[in-house]
A protein has these predicted regions:
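Conserved acidic catalytic loop of the alpha/beta-hydrolase fold
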Residues: 47-65
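Acidic catalytic loop of the alpha/beta-hydrolase fold
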Residues: 195-199, 225
Length: 327
């Protein structure tokens, strides 16, 4: 769970934010029911959360970008990347899973423990005393400083109401996106702490095994949320920086042309143009008539001020499009 205002100055996340924003634009958002977003949303579902991610990506106006899926954000990132391969240049999955806890461990004993955790959320999440919330904090960051543990407890309380925290927790426990793993087409980096108590290391292994070509980096840590002062942090930071440097996409050319001027459908057509497809091939790939493709191509030429298809392809590739079939 997150809270954009609280996260900014937290010892839990300062080093993460610096890593991810160094030399690149970082776009974050509080998910439905979290942080600064509307609380107690009546429509809470996995499909709704994926739709929220789609809305944020469209509103940002960025044609192609890498995504970091951390913890519960991982399944959402996987679903988005599987549905929008033309938009995602790379995927970083850290401390996350394909199968929620209730899916991967459907035993009576685990069901009893899950109910106990839900009871703890109901009783202690909103209390002034952090005693109940420390149960979750010490599982997430057992080797963290007292300051980081206190910050974790404070962010928990600020991020969601007890009722919403219960509903979100139950939703995440029952997620299963394992059927989407073989549909991912972008480069994928998987990182996971070996002694993670919240999301077992085996889930990171499963992701790396099931996603074709995934790069797997095991981390020698017990912390679900890696801390800046532990030896595993520079390992993670170096892996992420290297991976994004290779696959994070190029900045849009600074010539006055802007991909944001295109509609989502026009961006899809331009993605296929950048891959070198002709109009007939694009029509087959996108299930539309050649006449419709020609209309989209004409609109793209007009909006981006091109008259030559070859120059358009060069420009689009410089903007990060067309990489899927060329890397």
């Amino acid at each position: 769970m997150s809270h954009l205002d609280e996260d900014r100055d937290s010892p839990l996340w300062r080093h993460w934010l610096k890593l991810l924003s160094d030399g690149r634009q970082l776009t974050r958002f509080d998910g439905r029911g979290f942080g600064l977003s509307e609380r107690d949303s009546p429509a809470l579902s996995f499909e709704g959360l994926v739709a929220d991610l789609e809305a944020v990506a469209d509103a940002a106006g960025i044609a192609r970008f890498p995504i970091l899926g951390f913890c519960h954000g991982g399944p959402l990132a996987i679903a988005y990347a599987a549905r929008h391969p033309d938009r995602v240049s790379a995927l970083v999955l850290c401390g996350t899973y394909a199968q929620g806890r209730a899916v991967r461990n459907p035993t009576p004993q685990d069901a009893a423990e899950r109910q106990l955790l839900l009871n703890l959320i109901e009783l202690g999440w909103g209390q002034d005393s952090p005693a109940y919330r420390q149960v979750f904090a010490t599982r997430a960051i057992p080797d963290a400083t007292a300051e980081a543990l206190a910050s974790y407890c404070a962010i928990q309380r600020a991020s969601a109401t007890p009722g919403q925290a219960q509903r979100l927790t139950q939703l995440f426990w029952h997620i299963d996106v394992s059927d989407l793993l073989d549909k991912l087409r972008c480069p994928v980096l998987v990182l996971h702490a070996r002694r993670d108590d919240l999301v077992p290391f085996s889930q990171g292994q499963l992701l790396a095994q099931r996603i074709h070509g995934a790069r797997f980096v095991p981390l020698d840590s017990a912390n679900h949320d890696l801390q800046a002062d532990e030896p595993a942090w520079p390992v993670l930071a170096d892996a992420v920086q290297t991976f994004l440097g290779e696959h994070g996409g190029q900045p849009a050319p600074r010539d006055g042309r802007d991909l944001a001027a295109l509609t989502p459908r026009e961006r899809e057509v331009l993605e296929h143009i950048a891959r070198g497809l002709d109009n007939e091939e694009i029509a087959a790939a996108l299930f539309m008539s050649e006449k419709t493709v020609r209309n989209h191509v004409s609109a793209i030429f007009a909006k981006l001020d091109f008259t030559n298809r070859g120059r358009l392809i060069v420009w689009a590739r410089d903007a990060g499009l067309g990489r899927q079939h060329r890397d």
